[in-house]
Curated annotation (Swiss-Prot):
Class of the enzyme per the UniProt entry, highest EC level: transferase
One Pfam family this sequence matches: Methyltransf_2
A molecular function GO annotation: O-methyltransferase activity
CDD domains assigned to the protein according to its UniProt record, in alphabetical order: AdoMet_MTases
Organism: Oryza sativa subsp. japonica (Rice)
SUPFAM superfamilies: S-adenosyl-L-methionine-dependent methyltransferases (SSF53335), Winged helix' DNA-binding domain (SSF46785)
Domain of life of the source: Eukaryota
Binding-site positions, S-adenosyl-L-methionine: 216, 239, 260, 273
One GO term (biological process): methylation
Name of the featured protein: Probable inactive methyltransferase Os04g0175900
Keyword 4Fe-4S annotated: no
Length: 371
């Protein structure tokens, strides 16, 4: 390997040394090619690389060759080179860690180990939840194709980009595409598991509730988690008939089929997790039905991502703002809201009592709307 390489920077310029024009150029390139990180991470998960790095004995860092030995590769040498290049990119984004040593021929040999973020991309502990299914959903071809319709949807109004791409709204499409429906449900259930674990640790608004109604509760997994911690609660899992028909029998949970736009079962408290991502008119209709179903001193507990009032270039703002534009793309009238917008929804729906918020995790908040 040549050792006499030298580099002379342009006069007055040091690489990465504060040239504003260069910094803006590199930022532009990052925005253009950011998808390469998501797609490379997807491939790394599909190949089992993240799981293998996380499961390595005694935290040992592995070479690309050692990782490829576990794969059914046709050409191990070629595959090892490809894996090394993939992990090298992920290391530059702090997805994995990289150390370098001298290889057998004197060339650099890179070893990789998991960075902290890998815990959210492994199959791992089923009770923790994983973001791997969420990644697979977001970069799925059925999702990515919809973004090409975003500009047309903005100009034309009416149908969302998703609806323009697939000829029908998101949830209707899920009913026709079993593969995509399974992908969506797995992503949502895994993310919900993570959020609910944090909610049960940090939110104490379930004390004193006798009957808790989970509107849009799916197969009852969320209620099962709540009741395992608050055993005095009787749960009512409320969802559409075709969902309830698949719900298993759960101790302390009564499954009820219906439509939240028509009526909601009565209870001391009503739980709405990720149900108010719709337009204002639909959200107010849901909340008014909840208000009617509550006992005199009852409350609605909303658990959702909350937007910051001001956009800032920090992850705490970027994450909810990305989600908001995903709602714009996928659902007609869909949106993420600020605290003030939730407060207005509550007032417009008849909730005149206290409005309390508890920060949970990763921009999720628990919002209590008291009757």
């Amino acid at each position: 390997m040549a050792s006499g390489i030298s580099r002379t920077p342009a006069t007055g310029v040091t690489a990465g040394g504060g040239d504003d024009e260069e910094a803006a150029w590199l930022h532009a390139l990052e925005l253009i090619s950011g998808f390469t990180v998501s797609m490379t991470l997807k491939a790394a998960i599909q190949l089992g690389l993240i799981d293998a790095l996380t499961a390595a004995a005694d935290g040992r860092a592995l070479t690309a060759g050692e990782l490829v030995a576990q794969l059914p590769a046709v050409d191990d040498a070629e595959a090892a080179t490809s894996v090394d290049r993939m992990l090298r990119l992920l290391a530059s984004f702090n997805v994995v860690r990289c150390s370098t040593e001298a290889g057998p021929g004197g060339d650099p040999l890179r070893r990789y180990s998991p960075a902290p973020v890998c815990r959210w991309f492994t199959a791992g502990d089923n009770h923790q939840g994983s973001l791997a299914p969420r990644l697979m959903l977001d970069v799925d071809e059925d999702n990515l194709s919809t973004w090409h319709q975003m500009a047309a949807a903005v100009v034309s109004g009416g149908p969302s980009a998703f609806e323009r791409a697939h000829g029908m709204p998101l949830f209707e499409y899920m009913g026709t595409n079993h593969r995509f429906n399974m992908l969506f449900n797995q992503a949502m259930s895994q993310q919900s598991m993570m959020v609910m674990n944090k909610l049960l640790d940090r939110f104490h608004g379930f004390d004193g509730i006798s009957v808790l109604v989970d509107v849009g509760g799916g197969t009852g997994v969320t209620l099962k988690m709540i009741i395992s911690r608050y055993k005095h609660i009787t749960g009512v899992n409320f969802d559409l008939p075709h969902v309830i028909s698949q719900a298993p029998s759960l101790p302390g949970v009564n499954h009820v089929a219906g439509n939240m736009f028509e009526s909601v079962p009565k209870g001391d408290a009503i739980f709405l997790k990720s149900m108010l991502l719709r337009n204002d008119e639909e959200c107010i209709k849901i909340l008014k039905n909840c208000h009617y179903a509550l006992s005199d001193n009852g409350k609605v507990i909303v658990v959702d991502i909350v937007l910051p009032e001001t956009p800032k270039p920090v992850p705490e703002a970027q994450n909810p703002l990305r989600m908001d534009v995903m709602m714009l793309n996928n659902l007609r009238g869909g949106k993420i809201r600020t605290e003030q917008e939730y407060a207005k929804l509550a007032m417009d729906s008849g909730f005149s009592g206290s409005f309390r918020t508890t920060y949970i995790f990763a921009n999720f908040m628990a919002i209590e709307l008291c009757k």
